[in-house]
Amino acid sequence: MAREFSRTRRIAQQLQQELAQVLQRDIKDPRIGMVTVNDVDVSRDLNYAKVYVTFFEEDKAVVEEKLAALEAAAGYVRSLVAGRMKLRVMPEIRFIYDASLIEGMRMSNLVSQVITKDKAKAAEHGREDEELDDTEQDDK
């Protein structure tokens, strides 16, 4: 029976869960603050792991500072996670900022604004639209 997920994907999922717990509970660095682990991409040889994280900050300088703090703590985080996972070799962790969540929220807000503007215009011109609909039906 073929496996649904490859070994690297299963390890990446477990690594994501363990990293999220370690970053929330065990890391007490105030520079890092609230961090979300969005995804983990593990190399095929399991030597490297790219960890995609999001902070709830939009200021680029603050994001860079938090990312630098995570990179500085990467070795310590790696040792904590290695104690929780049963792997012969623990992947080297590299943190990468993932702006997709923030960008998605921004786009969602833009869509919501457009919808409310369209509804306002429709309500404003509602009578004209109703009259046009009646004349179109009479023509048929």
UniProtKB/Swiss-Prot annotation:
Q: Where is the composition biased (Acidic residues)?
A: 129-140
SUPFAM superfamilies tied to this protein: Ribosome-binding factor A, RbfA
Task: Tell me the segments the record calls region Disordered.
Answer: 121-140
InterPro entries registered for this protein in UniProt: KH_dom-like_a/b, RbfA, RbfA_dom_sf, Ribosome-bd_factorA_CS
Q: Which UniProt keywords apply?
A: Cytoplasm, Ribosome biogenesis
Where the protein is mainly located, per its record?
Answer: cytoplasm
Q: Where in the cell is it found?
A: Cytoplasm
What's a Gene Ontology MF term here?
ribosomal small subunit binding
Q: Name one GO biological process term.
A: maturation of SSU-rRNA
Which NCBIfam families has this protein been placed in? rbfA
Tell me, what does this protein do in biology? One of several proteins that assist in the late maturation steps of the functional core of the 30S ribosomal subunit. Associates with free 30S ribosomal subunits (but not with 30S subunits that are part of 70S ribosomes or polysomes). Required for efficient processing of 16S rRNA. May interact with the 5'-terminal helix region of 16S rRNA.
Q: What's the protein name?
A: Ribosome-binding factor A
Which organism was this protein described from?
A: Shewanella loihica (strain ATCC BAA-1088 / PV-4)
Please state the gene responsible for encoding this protein.
rbfA
